Amino acid sequence: MAIKSTEKHTPMMQQYLRLKSENPDILLFYRMGDFYELFYDDAKRASQLLEISLTKRGSSAGEPIPMAGLPYHAVEGYLAKLVQQGESVAICEQIGDPATSKGPVERKVVRIVTPGTVTDEALLPERFDNLIAAIYHHKGQFGYATLDITSGRFKVSEPSTEESMLAELQRTSPTELLFSEDFEPVHLLEKRNGNRRRPVWEFELDTAKQQLNQQFGTRDLVGFGVENAEFGLCAAGCLIQYVKDTQRTTLPHIRSIVMDRQDDSVILDAATRRNLEITQNLAGGFNHTLSEVLDHTSTAMGSRLLKRWLHQPIRTHDVLNQRLDAIGELKSNGLYAELSPQLKQIGDVERILARLALRSARPRDLARLRNALQQLPELAQSTQAFEQTHLLELASLAQPIDSICELLERAVKENPPVVIRDGGVLADGYNEELDQWRDLANGAALFLSKLEQEERERHDIDTLKVGYNNVHGFYIQISKGQSHKAPAHYVRRQTLKNAERYIIPELKAHEDKVLSSKSKALAIEKKLWEELFDQLLPHLEQLQLMANAISELDVLSNLAERADTLNYCRPTLSSDIGMKIEGGRHPVVEQVMSDPFIANPINLNDDRKMLIITGPNMGGKSTYMRQTALIALMAHVGCYVPADSAHIGLLDRIFTRIGASDDLASGRSTFMVEMTETANILHNATQHSLVLMDEIGRGTSTYDGLSLAWASAEWLATKINAMTLFATHYFELTELPNLFSGLANVHLDAVEHGDEIAFMHAVQEGAANKSYGLAVASLAGVPKAVIKKAKQKLQQLENGQPKNQSLTSTQIKQEHQLSLIPEPSEVEEALAKVNPDDLSPRQALEALYRLKALL
């Protein structure tokens, strides 16, 4: 917007341009009456983003002014659209009185809505965290800070590499990201909405410490354990300053800052989070994910907490066993069924408290807070049955808070209006002075009814009515047919098509009295509303602790229900290396299958640290690998797992190299993506890591791919000693267990009958004897003629015939001849592979079901 000088503009446009100059990089919603208007480039941009009309408002300084507008009562919907697109908006309100203003009404920016700092319900995803973050980079080191303004959770970390920084961005998924003007690794910021460039000085360490100490009311940061995290503090300082600037108010609910230490967590890189489909599937949706299966929480704040747990599995066995003990108690006594309906009535207290802290809570927020507090006595009654220590701690924090509940019951009407603007929020009887002025204003109805009746009878005018509108105030209306009966002291105020409107001294006096009393009542109510905030805010910390306790109680109760309903078992956690799972199942796949899921065991230990997995495509290799990782992840979240039994050793990281696609935006081929992920694993995996490697080397020539797969497997097995599941189509790799200790071959079974194949999905010891690739191609719908040609070519290759030798017509004709010897049936082939002595009762029953299905 090129504006040389404001002198040539109208006073109103001068005011607009001054406010716009204070907020140059974001959209300015400028309040004019019942509309928010945008001008110049803001109007053009908003018309594109919101698909609203672009018009012109006269001219200023001799040029037409582009303009776009939207009604104030619908602003939340438009803000939601802008926030979703990563835009920020300055909300400019009229704060002066138009009746007394000389020149333009006084206006000022009262808040700035940004993607990471929104607290309004309409603008927030209900069951997902909404984080704002800041990133700092210096000499290869990173500082990273995140803030959830709706809860006050403020964290810093110091990722040591670009890979770990990328993993943190993937885990936290901030909707707004602040970075300095001299930030170098800008590729980390690609494909993100809500990036905000900030001045370099905002990231200075001394400035950051000053900002943080001011926020927490402390002299130093030693008590928070972050004083040595200088890079993290640089990011945190910029972040807290930005949030203060946008909110235009104090932030009393942000009282501490926490160091997010990688040593306490099982680290998941970006590829692993994507491949395991924890909260988002590979297509970007939310169905068929781990969280969809596990998240039956009763409250939105519980749902958000569960997702945080899933994305940050922990290594602290004391905490994990504490969670498992709590789930076990809730499951064994069935108490989760009693808690669930009570928790549903409590709602999203966490975000209500954030709006309370920012003094932006609306009347219905406080009504919902009151309703939540009214549920606590019944919840306390249910929690009396608790015995487990952690459950008792949570119950003690969720006890009734009678003083606040009683205050809100006295103060707020049962069903208040949406906003305080027009009053009618505070309950009758809450304040004597307010009641008196309300009674005076409400007495108008009786007065008007009485006046109307008296005037009708006195002047014999049966069409006479007393009414009111915002423009003309109170009036007496008489139809045109009877207007000749209007007495002389009736002063005509307005002529309509079919009626005349008049005013009389008594009505005018009453109008002044009523409007004065309404205005006085509204002023008193708004003052009392602000005082109500003052009474509630000293209890904010207690209320937040209550909300946190209820969130965790909701998650634990939910996980108990899931464990009971889905037949999960309690994992045994160990500090030893390895894992032993009997009857393991994929938590997501088993829920979407119509047939019974084939459970499989896995055993990894010091003598068996790598499994070379072979078998057909579609045989279940990837499912088997993913279910192992998901069971390990769930155990480190502290929840029950889909298995008959599970002993899980200590993990520091989970890596997955499963599937790949071209990264066209970065100019990386499928093979380049695969090798980048493989390099990350080979550099960062340890003996405490769980590594999933699926089909390494597919994207290049056979010998290159085989060589890379062999070398990678050998390195993992001999140098790193990581617990590894290594799926491959290179049968040469099945020789590795003969060459190195700690390796074993397993395969997923399949039965071929004629041109058909049945996948048994059962993991067997030893290597597969063939790949069944042509059978899978046939299942996929490859034309039969192509399959026949492929079979003939395969036979040539297996018999050592020259690769360029053509098939003869005689050979092709032979394909159509019938065999005189009947082929064994599919069931017979499957039965021949079953060894009854190797089967447990459950496996025998599953085998019987599979054989039955083949008939």
Curated annotation (Swiss-Prot):
InterPro entries in alphabetical order: DNA_mismatch_repair_MutS, DNA_mismatch_repair_MutS-lik_N, DNA_mismatch_repair_MutS/MSH, DNA_mismatch_repair_MutS_C, DNA_mismatch_repair_MutS_clamp, DNA_mismatch_repair_MutS_core, DNA_mismatch_repair_MutS_N, DNA_mismatch_repair_MutS_sf
Pfam families cross-referenced by the UniProt entry: MutS_I (PF01624), MutS_II (PF05188), MutS_III (PF05192), MutS_IV (PF05190), MutS_V (PF00488)
Residue positions binding ATP: 615-622
Alphabetized SMART domains for the sequence: MUTSac, MUTSd
GO annotation (BP), single: mismatch repair
Gene Ontology, cellular component aspect: cytosol
Coiled coil start-end: none
Alphabetic keyword roster: ATP-binding, DNA damage, DNA repair, DNA-binding, Nucleotide-binding
Keyword DNA-binding assigned: yes
GO terms for MF: ATP binding; ATP-dependent DNA damage sensor activity; damaged DNA binding; mismatched DNA binding
Protein's job: This protein is involved in the repair of mismatches in DNA. It is possible that it carries out the mismatch recognition step. This protein has a weak ATPase activity.
Family: Belongs to the DNA mismatch repair MutS family.
This protein's name: DNA mismatch repair protein MutS
Organism: Aliivibrio salmonicida (strain LFI1238)
Lineage, broadest ranks: Bacteria, Pseudomonadati, Pseudomonadota, Gammaproteobacteria, Vibrionales
